[in-house]
C-alpha cells in the first residue's frame, strides 16, 4: 500500500490535542540502551535548596542512556571501498594485509552508494530497489548481509540528485518490503543530505540553464510560494523538500536517516519520522561565518533525546581559509599521494584541509558527546600513503590518528551517558545556523534571535575570525569556561504532549529562548514541567504571553526602563553591563518571590519563585540581549565576539554552579559522562594549533593549558587518565593536569 507524506501543519494539528496527565520521571544509575528494555524505576526529584535556582540529579534518566544498534552504542562507519568492505578484492599496492586487518576496517558499519546517476525518462525514481544499483554494488550488498554489521544505503538517484525532485513516482512497495526483510542489518537509508544548505543552493540556482525546464519550473513554483523572509514559510519550504525525498524513498519512517550540515534541522526531521539523525561538520565558511561544531552537538543530541532516536557524526575535512601568503583558498582538502610513478607530480596535497589535530579532536568530541557512529568523508584519499619499503599502501598520519581513536572506543566501550542537565528551548521555525545569526540565514534579525545567539555565543564564545584566520588560528571547537552540559529541545514540534513532557522532565533546568508564539499549550507544558520539579528560566517578554503572576511570582507594571553599567546579585557581587538593555518593570505578585538581581538604582532585574516542586526564574531585560539598531551589524559583532551577554552569562553560570558536579578551572573545553560506577570528565585544549589552508599544522608547545579540577561532592576512590594511561594523584578532592595544545584528556573517576 502506498503511504502518503504528511505535511507539517497536519502533524501539528494532530499534536495540538494535548492532555494534562502527570509524567513520571524515570532514572537509574548507569547506562544502557533506550531500546533495550530496561526496567525503569520512578524516583523522587530533588528540590532546590536555599541559594540554589536548580536541583541537581546525578543519577541520569533512562531516556538519556545511549541507544544501541545491533547490540552496540557506537560504530565506526566507512563507505564501501577497498579495506572497509571485505567483499572487495584487494590488488596491487592495495593488497596490504597489515592495513586490511586493522580493527577499524574489520569491525565497521558500511555505507553503500548505488552508483547510478541517471533516471528512466519522465520518472523521478527507479521502481524497484535493485534497479538503483549497478550489479557489482548489488552483489557486494547481498554478501554484506552476513557480516553482522550495520549497513546504510544511499540510493541513486542519490538524495542530492536534483532530477529526482520532479517526475513521476512509481514505486514497488512490495519489492522494498521484501528487500528490507532480506537485509535485516540495513539500519538506515540516507533520505536527504545537507538538507538546509542543499535547499538554499537549489533556490538560488533555480533558473540555472543546466536544469531541465521541468526542474526550473518546480523550483520557481516553490520559490514563489514561500517567502524567504518569513521563518514559517521557510519551514514549509524545508518540509516540501524533505517530503519529496521521503516520497522517492518509499516514505519509510523505519529507516529514515536525515543528514544535515550548516542548518540545525534535526528536530524538524525527527518530528517528521526520522529514526537516525546525522550532523555533518566541516571547515568551510567565509571570513566571518564559522562552522561551530560544539553548538551542533547540542542541537542534534537534544533532538535525539527528545524523540528517542539515533544520531551520528560525519566529518568532512574541507577548509576555507587563508593561505600563508594571505590569499583566500576555498575547499582546501588533505590528500596523501599513493602514486607509484614519482615522475608525475601528485595532485594530492597532504598539507591542505583542516588540521590533523582538529580532525582527531572532533572524533573524541563526538564520541564523548554520545554519537552512535562517526563517518569520515573522503577517507580513501587522506588515510593512506604509498610506502616505498613495502611497495604497498600504508596508513598516513591521519589514518593512524583515526585507527588509534577507533581502538580507544573498542578498549573503552562504556563511555557512559553525556551529562546535560539543562535544556535550551528554541522554536521549530528557527532554522538555526551553525554560525548563528538570522533565522534560516535570511529572515529579519530580531531581539529574540539575539537572545538565542546570546546563549550559544556565551557557551561557545565568538572570536574574531577575520583577524585570527589570517594568523592561522583554526577555531571550529572552542575553549570555554562553561561545561558542555546543554541540549536543545523544541516545544512546538508536532510531538504528542505527553512525549514532549517525558523528554523535558529529564532535565533539571530549562531556558525558554527565542520567539515562541503565544500559546495556551506552551504555558500549560511549562507549568507542568515546573510543578513536577523543573527550573524554568523565563524572559519577561513572556509575561505578556500568558505566563502570569501565579506562575512567576511577579507581574509586569507595563513600564520600561534602561539598564546599563552594572547589576548586583543576591550574594552582593557586582557584575558589569556593557551596552543598553530595555527592561520590563517587575513588581512582586507574591511575598514568596525572591529578588536575585537588581540594577544600580535598586530596580528588579531577576527573581526566583517556587511553583509546585520547581522554580521559575524571571529575567527582566528583554530577551537578555542588548539593544541594537542594525540586525546585520549585531550578527557580525556577535560572531566576532565583540558583544557580551552578561545576563545570559549570569544565568548560565548560576545553573552550572548548581548542576555540574565538578569545578574545572583553566583554558579548556570540557564535559562529563555519567557511568555505572562513576564518571568520565573529559577536557580538550583547542588552542595552540596554527593551520593555514595550504600548510601543515604547527603546534605551539607554549599553548599548553594547566587545569585544576575540584571533584566537589563526588567521592573519588581513584582517578585515571585514559588516553595516556596515567594514574592521577588526588589531594583534598582536587587534582591538577596539563593538557597539551590540540590534545584531549579523559579522566576516569571511580566512586
Language-model segments: what does each one mean?
Residues 516-604, 652:
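A glycine-rich, often tryptophan-bearing local segment used as a flexible ligand/cofactor-contacting loop or short
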Residues 311-322, 340-388:
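Substrate-binding cleft of secreted/luminal carbohydrate-active enzymes
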Residues 259-346, 362:
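Glycoside hydrolase catalytic-domain groove-lining segments
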Residues 51, 55-62, 66-70, 86, ...:
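Aromatic-Pro/Gly-enriched surface loop or interdomain linker
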Residues 99, 106, 120-124, 128-131, ...:
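Helical hinge/lid and interdomain linker segments adjacent to catalytic or ligand-binding clefts
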Residues 77-78, 154-157, 190-192, 227-263, ...:
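Aromatic-lined carbohydrate-recognition surfaces of secreted/lumenal glycan-active proteins
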Residues 417-452, 505-507, 527, 605-626, ...:
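Carbohydrate-binding surface patches
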Residues 19-141, 146, 150-152, 176-178, ...:
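Mature N-terminal, pre-catalytic/accessory segment of carbohydrate-active enzymes
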Amino acid at each position: 500500500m502506498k503511504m502518503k507524506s504528511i505535511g507539517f501543519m497536519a502533524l501539528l494539528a494532530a499534536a495540538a490535542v494535548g492532555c494534562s496527565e502527570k509524567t513520571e520521571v524515570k532514572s537509574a544509575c548507569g547506562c544502557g540502551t533506550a531500546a533495550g528494555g530496561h526496567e525503569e524505576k520512578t524516583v523522587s526529584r530533588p528540590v532546590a535548596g536555599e541559594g540554589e535556582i536548580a536541583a541537581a540529579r546525578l543519577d541520569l534518566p533512562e531516556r538519556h542512556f545511549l541507544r544501541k544498534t545491533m547490540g552496540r552504542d557506537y560504530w565506526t562507519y566507512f563507505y564501501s571501498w577497498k579495506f572497509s568492505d571485505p567483499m572487495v578484492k584487494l590488488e596491487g599496492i592495495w593488497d596490504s594485509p597489515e592495513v586490511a586487518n586493522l580493527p577499524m576496517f574489520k569491525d565497521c558499519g558500511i555505507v553503500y552508494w548505488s552508483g547510478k546517476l541517471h533516471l528512466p525518462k519522465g520518472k523521478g525514481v527507479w521502481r524497484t530497489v535493485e534497479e538503483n544499483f549497478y550489479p557489482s554494488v548489488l552483489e557486494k550488498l547481498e554478501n554484506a548481509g552476513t557480516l553482522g554489521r550495520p549497513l546504510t544505503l544511499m540510493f541513486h538517484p542519490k538524495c542530492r540528485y536534483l532530477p529526482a525532485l520532479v517526475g513521476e513516482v512509481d514505486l514497488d512497495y512490495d519489492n522494498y518490503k521484501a528487500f528490507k526483510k532480506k537485509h535485516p542489518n540495513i539500519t538506515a537509508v540516507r533520505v536527504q543530505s545537507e538538507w538546509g544548505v542543499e535547499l538554499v543552493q537549489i533556490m538560488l540556482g533555480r533558473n540555472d540553464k543546466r536544469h531541465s525546464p521541468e526542474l526550473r519550473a518546480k523550483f520557481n513554483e516553490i520559490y514563489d510560494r514561500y517567502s524567504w523572509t518569513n521563518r514559517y514559510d521557510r519551514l514549509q519550504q524545508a518540509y516540501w523538500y524533505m517530503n519529496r525525498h521521503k516520497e522517492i524513498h518509499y516514505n519509510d519512517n523505519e529507516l529514515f536517516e536525515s543528514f544535515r550540515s550548516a542548518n540545525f534541522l534535526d528536530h524538524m526531521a525527527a518530528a517528521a519520522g526520522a529514526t537516525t539523525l546525522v550532523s555533518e561538520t566541516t571547515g568551510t565558511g567565509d571570513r566571518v561565518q564559522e562552522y561551530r561544531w560544539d553548538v551542533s552537538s547540542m542541537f542534534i543530541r537534544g533532538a535525539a533525546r527528545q524523540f528517542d532516536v539515533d544520531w551520528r557524526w560525519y566529518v568532512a575535512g574541507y577548509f576555507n581559509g587563508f593561505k600563508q601568503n594571505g590569499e583566500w583558498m576555498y575547499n582546501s582538502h588533505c590528500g596523501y599521494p599513493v602514486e607509484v610513478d614519482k615522475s608525475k607530480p601528485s595532485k594530492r596535497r597532504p598539507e591542505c584541509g583542516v588540521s590533523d589535530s582538529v580532525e582527531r579532536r572532533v572524533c573524541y568530541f563526538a564520541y564523548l558527546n554520545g554519537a552512535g557512529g562517526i563517518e569520515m568523508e573522503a577517507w580513501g584519499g587522506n588515510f593512506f600513503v604509498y610506502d616505498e619499503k613495502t611497495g604497498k599502501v600504508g596508513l598516513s598520519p591521519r589514518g593512524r590518528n583515526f585507527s588509534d581513536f577507533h581502538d580507544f572506543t573498542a578498549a573503552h566501550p562504556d563511555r557512559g551517558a553525556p551529562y546535560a542537565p539543562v535544556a535550551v528551548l528554541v522554536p521549530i521555525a528557527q532554522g538555526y545556523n551553525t554560525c548563528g545569526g538570522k533565522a534560516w540565514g535570511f529572515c529579519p534579525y530580531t531581539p529574540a534571535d539575539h537572545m538565542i545567539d546570546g546563549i550559544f555565543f556565551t557557551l561557545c564564545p565568538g572570536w574574531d575570525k577575520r583577524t585570527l584566520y589570517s594568523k592561522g588560528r583554526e577555531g571550529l571547537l572552542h575553549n570555554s569556561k562553561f561545561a558542555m552540559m546543554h541540549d536543545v529541545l523544541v516545544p512546538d514540534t508536532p510531538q504528542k504532549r505527553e512525549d514532549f513532557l517525558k523528554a523535558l522532565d529529564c532535565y533539571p533546568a530549562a531556558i525558554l529562548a527565542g520567539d515562541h508564539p503565544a500559546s495556551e499549550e506552551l504555558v500549560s507544558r511549562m507549568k507542568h514541567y515546573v510543578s513536577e520539579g523543573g527550573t524554568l528560566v523565563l524572559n519577561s517578554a513572556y509575561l505578556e504571553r500568558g505566563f502570569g503572576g501565579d506562575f512567576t511570582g511577579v507581574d509586569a507594571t507595563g513600564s520600561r526602563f534602561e539598564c546599563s553599567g552594572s547589576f548586583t546579585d543576591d550574594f552582593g557581587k557586582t557584575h558589569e553591563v556593557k551596552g543598553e538593555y530595555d527592561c520590563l518593570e517587575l513588581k512582586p505578585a507574591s511575598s514568596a518571590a525572591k529578588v536575585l538581581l537588581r540594577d544600580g538604582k535598586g530596580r528588579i532585574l531577576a527573581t526566583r519563585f517556587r511553583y509546585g516542586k520547581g522554580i521559575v526564574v524571571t529575567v527582566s531585560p528583554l530577551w537578555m540581549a542588548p539593544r541594537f539598531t542594525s540586525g546585520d551589524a549585531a550578527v557580525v559583532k556577535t560572531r566576532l565576539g565583540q558583544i557580551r551577554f552578561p545576563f545570559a552569562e549570569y544565568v548560565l553560570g548560576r545553573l552550572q554552579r548548581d548542576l555540574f558536579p565538578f569545578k574545572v578551572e583553566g583554558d579548556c573545553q570540557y564535559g562529563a559522562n555519567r557511568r555505572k560506577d562513576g564518571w568520565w570528565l573529559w577536557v580538550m585544549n583547542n588552542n595552540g594549533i596554527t593551520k593555514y589552508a595550504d600548510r601543515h599544522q604547527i603546534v605551539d608547545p607554549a599553548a599548553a593549558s594547566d587545569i585544576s579540577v575540584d571533584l566537589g561532592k563526588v567521592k573519588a576512590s581513584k582517578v585515571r587518565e585514559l588516553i595516556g594511561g596515567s594514574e592521577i594523584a588526588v589531594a583534598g578532592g582536587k587534582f591538577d593536569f596539563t593538557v597539551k595544545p590540540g590534545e584531549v584528556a579523559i579522566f576516569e573517576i571511580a566512586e
